[in-house]
């Protein structure tokens, strides 16, 4: 009886104590989320690649928030997948930069869990930049592209092009075109509309342009499209029409490339203006055929040496015959 009583008394106390622990444990389980968050790279990682390594995933739940920032508070753009299972960045990361990651996930019962992490991206041994035109704050013509000349040949053009964002007011579709592996131009399919405001964001810092070679530019450039002025040269008729805002305002007699030195066809943009310059045939593969030290009013049309320029030595060629080595010549006087 004593034994039974003792057992009975112990069971009741234990039962009371046991129920208490059971309730506490159940309560804890009811508030703790079953969702689990995993962040890659690991917390504290260093020399992390700027592309491909950052990813956040959730198990037994869905991600509801992911914020990745650098030390200055600038957020990394990214998106949570439709099923809530993962988050990936939509762009590369900057090089030599410390980042923090804050992620939140919830389970089927709506209970949340959070995970925080830090890491630092790699410091490149080799880098590249893009020299660009037009300059920030400039006003340019309706045919002017935004042109980048890179200091290293680019073997990952899609990644580099993706890192350049162009916005315009009014909105217009702008396309990129590569010339070889070191030049990239952006322009609309037709001429710009006069008055268009163009903003270019160069987010090249950290983008891998070729194996082991990373961009180092992070810059914003803005320029404005001025009035519409287009000059149309007819090499057969030896004339040039100047069209401003859709109206012909002037017709000029010209001379273009002689037989064997024909002027290139197509649309070309004036990219440089020189009051006076020297033109030497040696620089374009024409040997000693000419060396004119004071060519007036020279305007560059191509990187290969095609210009439209003043000409004081052409005699009666203007409007009558083509006599140049490929340039478009207009009657001018010595010294401009």
Q: Each predicted region: which residue ranges?
A:
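Extracellular/periplasmic catalytic domains that process cell-envelope and extracellular macromolecules
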Residues: 177-179, 193, 223-225, 232-235, ...
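Post-signal peptide N-terminal regions of Sec-secreted extracellular proteins
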Residues: 120-129, 142-143, 258-261, 265, ...
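Acidic, low-complexity Ser/Thr/Gly/Pro-rich repeat segments typical of extracellular/periplasmic
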Residues: 1-227, 254
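Short, solvent-exposed loop/turn elements at domain surfaces
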Residues: 65-67, 157-159, 240-242, 263, ...
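Short beta-strands and strand-coil junctions in structured, solvent-facing domains, enriched
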Residues: 154-157, 208-210, 239, 260, ...
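Active-site-proximal beta-strand/loop segments in catalytic clefts of secreted hydrolases
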Residues: 235-236, 243-245, 254-257, 271-274, ...
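A structural motif detector for short, solvent-exposed N-terminal "entry" segments of globular domains
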Residues: 219-260
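Exported/periplasmic cell-wall-interacting domains
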Residues: 142, 265, 281-336
